[in-house]
Design a protein with these regions (language model features):
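Short acidic/glycine-rich loops and adjacent helix/strand connectors
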Residues: 1-214
């Protein structure tokens, strides 16, 4: 589950960040983060026309290449994923350009032209872990339910660059496997996994399920 949020970065430093749910009071809110964006701008005391770039932690262009990889190799109806992109982007004269790691397009808001980058989900996870770390070079492993069509990425970070070495694609996902057990225990999958993590402190491996799962 991707929760709507916004963050403002100036000269490589995070100035403000806020999830939309804190402002609209809707748990796990997935609406366009208008209030969160306004909060960040107000926090930094700047206007929207002072923004140079916009980055999104998901690359919808990957979905334009094929349908659900669980069922088919090619997409049959692209409209299934159009809701991921605001209308003003879809109607833009410059179409979304496809790339393996990120896609971009330019839009005009008033007189200002903005570059919008759609970065693959797992690359964002990798950057979030590597760049704030004290390491100049490091092996990186990302694993969640699903990115665009990846479930696991093996990468290496070297100074200011991150290189993808290998990827695992859905449905082969340890994250989805974990979510299945979250639902089995009576919780909401893709939302309550943290509760299962907390419960694990009270568990014991000396039971009949341990060997079965292993």
């Amino acid at each position: 589950m991707y929760i709507s949020s916004a963050a403002l970065i100036i000269d490589g430093k995070v100035i403000a960040a806020c999830p939309e749910e804190r402002l609209n009071r809707e748990k796990f809110s997935r609406v366009f983060p208008k209030k969160a964006i306004n909060y960040c701008l107000k926090k930094a005391n700047i206007k929207f026309d002072q923004i140079d770039y916009i980055a999104n932690s998901y690359n919808p262009a990957v979905h334009f290449k094929k349908f659900n990889p669980i069922f088919s190799n090619y997409r049959r109806f692209r409209g299934d994923y159009y809701y991921l992109i605001p209308d003003f982007l879809l109607n833009n004269e410059r179409p979304l350009k496809e790339d393996s790691e990120y896609s971009y397009q330019k839009i005009k808001l008033g007189k200002k032209e903005l570059n919008i980058y759609y970065i693959t989900h797992h690359l964002c996870h990798a950057a979030n872990g590597f760049y704030p770390s004290p390491f100049k070079k490091s092996a990186i492993l990302t694993a969640d339910g699903v990115g665009e069509d990846d479930s696991v990425n093996f990468l290496v970070g070297d100074n200011n660059k991150i290189k993808l070495l290998k990827r695992l694609k859905i449905p082969h996902s340890t994250g989805s496997f974990y979510s299945t057990f979250t639902e089995f225990f009576g919780y909401k999958p893709e939302a309550d996994e943290w509760k299962v993590m907390a419960l694990s402190a009270y568990g014991s491996k000396n039971n009949k399920y341990y060997k079965l799962i292993r």
